[in-house]
Amino acid sequence: VPWLGKVILGTTDSPRQDVVREPLPFKEEVAFILNESARYLSRAPKQEDIRSIWVGLRPLVKPQDEDGGNTKSISREHTVLASRSGLVTVTGGKWTTYRAMAEDVLQKCFDTGVLPPKAAGITNQLPLVGSPVGAVQHSISDAPGIHLYGAEAAAVASLPGSAKELGGGLTEAMVRFAARFEYARTVEDVLARRSRLLFLDARKAIDMAPAVAGILQEELGIDPQLPAFLALAQQYLRPEM
């Protein structure tokens, strides 16, 4: 899948018994993905082509009439359940359908009386932050990556360091914007959540981390947790096979 100038290869379907915050990949999974990709790409990918590798655990809702042994047959759709106590639970699903999941949760709350019924929601017409209403043209310089901010581009360009590239598509101003307006508080917030550099190129994220930490320290005056990020990012480097 093409993504932000890179290519994501995956996925695997390996049941796991351990539940940890940052699961590590199985070497067999990495080998499987490389071997399968070689069947479809003009040049077979190799270990040294890997820039970052990560694992996520997907919650699947097991049907009551199945033993759950074959995870491939279990639906990837989300499920909303309401208990007798009034607890409403959403499980399964994926981040890309978060709005639909939220709507279904609220509808379940209305249907079960947990919340008083309200008129139809506005989610379908609600623009995301930064989405301009109509065409908007800003008199700003061609700062790197500034187009990604939509209607907030002018605000990013007005901050110190808008032309100072740190690498990985980030400028100093983007880090400042993340700290001031996007509630970024740590290096991980910036390099893994406000941007996706950790997932695109772990080594580059490691190299940039001290500069990002310095900007956050200047902006916020708090510990940006640089050592914690460096330890985390090491796990995203390709494993030795």
Describe each model-derived feature in a short phrase.
Residues 3-6, 12-241:
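C-terminal accessory subdomains/tails of enzymes that are appended
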